[in-house]
Amino acid sequence: MGKGSRITAGLLVALGALTFAAVAACAQQRAGQPQGKQGTGKARQGGVLVGQGAMGDWTTDAPGVRRRITTADLPKPYETRSVDQGPRLVPRPEGAWPQVPAGFKVEEFAAGLQRPRLIRTAPNGDLFVAESYSGRVRVLRAGKEPGRAEVNEVFAADLARPFGIAFYPHGPDPQYVYVANTGSVVRFPYRNGDLKARAPAEVVVPDIPGGGQLRGGGHWTRDIAFTRDGRKMFVSVGSLTNVWERPDDKEERRADILEYNPDGTGFRVYAYGIRNAVGIAVHPETGELWASVNERDGLGDDLVPDYITRVREGGFYGWPWYYLGPNQDPRHPGARPDLRDKVIVPDVLIQSHSASLQMEFYTGRQFPQGYAGHAFAAEHGSWNRARRTGYKVIRVPVNRGVPTGEYEDFMTGFVTPAGDVWGRPVGVTVAKDGSLIVTDDGSNSVWRVSYTGK
């Protein structure tokens, strides 16, 4: 490449970076002045976007933007038309890079994966990634430079859409890696540092209801988590349909969180009416189960908000007859009045159709103290919304185990100025060094967010 070409290329990169920086800055400025219908009602309250102003779209996203959505903000069903507008994925443009708050740095930890989905950190620091569509679980390991994977190996293959991953028992020396396939839970014998499964998979739970196509409403992801004492295992199972068509009964063992003993015995339904808890996690201090949930489609742009919530034992969360309390789904008029007053209102409502996926509590020590104990969640992005939302990682403030009810954009920038999408966050995990690791099945990358203070 000649000198002139190098100068031209450099200018293009610089211009691209400036364009994306300008878009991010404008988004932050617009966040207090949403456009169109979003400008109705009170937009801010103490620096937090509220009411219709909190609904917004990707143009109001930027690191540090805070939102609070309540049931009082919900529009009526069908107030806007239900649209089919999935993202048009494009290669990452020159100069495009995820945006994070000041003092943080983003590095591409690994590239070229096959649609990386959920990710979890092993006690020794290895990162286990589900490549669900390829039927694999992969192991990534940093080298001397923490910002780049030096080891990239397939731990197990020929699995059936693996998603959830968990190490058992808790502590520095687990004996098993559990993997949740779409129709079963299996486990592999494991010792710290294993890059390959040392034995074939042992089936622990053989009969989880599986199948379904996500776009058509059927949900195939299964996450798993263990109680703090290791005596129980939770498995999340999404609904088979987007809107259940039978008025009085519900799909068997779907739209539930199931509970088992670690050996697969002792089955019971822990909580129900949770349409699709893609991500679950146990709070490290309180021991409470939390879930990151995708709500239903077809009722308009701002119905029904996704949510992140503590999950109450025996609790009913509404699906398919109600949503977010005693709000009846109009597609099930008059159905199940006996359950109306039992519906639990979730803790934190997220912009509708954001597709909230994996969640994780921050237990590291690298980030500033104000992040300790807060939750992070990956928002994969909308398809059933005229104005795109999601395509980001959010932070959910937690005070002594109790969510405050608001959330904050933490990692944005995955949408181009033209509205095309180049990245879709799926998984989040806290690395052993305290950095935050994010999987992105839009660009097939794994990102590392570290705090530098600069």
Q: What role is predicted for each listed range?
A:
Residues G10-A22:
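Bacterial N-terminal signal peptides
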Residues W97-P98, N124-A149, G193:
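Beta-propeller domains
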Residues L127-V129, Q175-V179, K232-V235, L289-A291, ...:
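Hydrophobic beta-strand segments that make up the repeating blades of beta-propeller
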Residues E108-L113, V154-A160, V204-P209, Q213-G216, ...:
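Surface loop/turn motifs at the tips and blade-to-blade linkers of beta-strand repeat domains
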Residues K42-P101, P174, V186, T221, ...:
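Beta-propeller domain segments
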Residues E150-N152, A156-Y168, Q175, N181-D229, ...:
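Asp-box/WD-like beta-propeller blade repeats and closely related beta-sheet repeat scaffolds
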